């Protein structure tokens, strides 16, 4: 398997043959499971020449406690209805598009628009109309009939065997937000935000007496976090800290995570420690109490914009 595949977030595939593992990775991420694409590629036995077929993806899905449910329709409208049914249940769906040559993930249907994750795009998340998705999805079965072949629509729903306590809600508005250039870092490091937030927050539950959304929690405590982290670090700005807190709120609300009111003090301490560690990694820290300190990391160079698809 090729080198250069790495774990977190929404980022483009580095080659032409790993779209299948990336599509399954994005489906698992929507179900709250963070799996390295290398693990999926290894389990599926993805090959540089032939890529990954549906049998290999099904094997990988089973290894991560999911089943691929195959649905086939010959009528476009019937195919759309089946796709929408799964998406309304918040079950991510894999489609093989471009005449069965490329895997994508569909996460949501909203007013005949569909939220799609395509690992050859950058940014990966996009919104497609039904005619756009239909034309991309349909497959002419020339293996069956060469002249005037039948048109087929195949989908594979990623059905979890495990109890899903959190599921992502990638609405059209959320995808538009993530596609902004200034939010590229958030998209690329999505897993890191989610992993940390799952330690601080809880999935929504009727057993939580006083659940606080991250928005409400930050309304009460953000000013304290801003002032104390900025004061103690000394070389980080309020705007920079505020941006990280905004990103945390965005990820938290995408999965519907909450903070029990009884755990507010602990959550506040966790966030203060987490933001302080981030500030040190971003800007370094001077020596203190006899330690040598750490140098600030150099500012990353601006990347050139690329036109077209990878």
Can you say where each PLM-predicted feature lies in the sequence?
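Active-site catalytic microenvironments for nucleophilic, acid-base chemistry
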Residues: 26-31, 63, 83, 109
């Amino acid at each position: 398997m090729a080198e250069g595949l790495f774990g977190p977030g929404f980022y483009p595939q580095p080659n032409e043959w790993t779209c299948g593992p990336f599509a399954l990775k994005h489906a698992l991420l929507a179900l709250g499971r963070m799996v390295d694409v290398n693990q999926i590629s290894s389990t599926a036995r993805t090959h540089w020449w032939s890529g990954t077929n549906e049998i290999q993806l099904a094997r990988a899905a089973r290894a991560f406690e999911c089943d691929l449910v195959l649905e086939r329709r010959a009528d476009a409208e019937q195919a759309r209805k089946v796709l929408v049914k799964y998406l309304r249940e918040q079950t991510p769906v894999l489609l093989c598009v471009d005449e069965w040559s490329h895997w994508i993930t569909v996460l949501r249907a909203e007013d005949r628009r569909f939220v799609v994750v395509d690992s050859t795009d950058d940014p990966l998340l996009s919104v497609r109309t039904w005619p756009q998705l239909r034309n991309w999805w349909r497959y002419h079965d020339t293996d069956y009939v060469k002249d005037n072949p039948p048109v087929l629509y195949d989908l594979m729903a990623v059905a979890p065997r495990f109890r899903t306590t959190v599921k992502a809600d990638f609405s059209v508005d959320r995808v538009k937000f993530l596609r902004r250039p200034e939010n590229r870092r958030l998209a690329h490091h999505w897993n890191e935000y989610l992993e940390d937030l799952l330690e601080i927050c809880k999935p929504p539950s009727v057993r939580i007496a006083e659940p606080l959304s991250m928005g409400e929690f930050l309304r009460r405590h953000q000013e304290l976090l801003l002032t104390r982290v900025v004061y103690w670090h000394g070389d980080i700005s309020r705007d920079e800290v505020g941006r990280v807190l905004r990103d945390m709120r965005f990820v938290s609300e995408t999965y519907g995570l909450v903070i029990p009111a009884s755990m507010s003090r602990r959550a506040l301490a966790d966030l203060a420690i987490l933001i302080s560690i981030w500030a040190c990694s971003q800007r370094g820290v001077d020596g203190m109490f006899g330690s040598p300190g750490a140098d600030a990391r150099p500012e990353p160079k601006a990347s050139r914009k690329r036109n077209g698809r990878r």
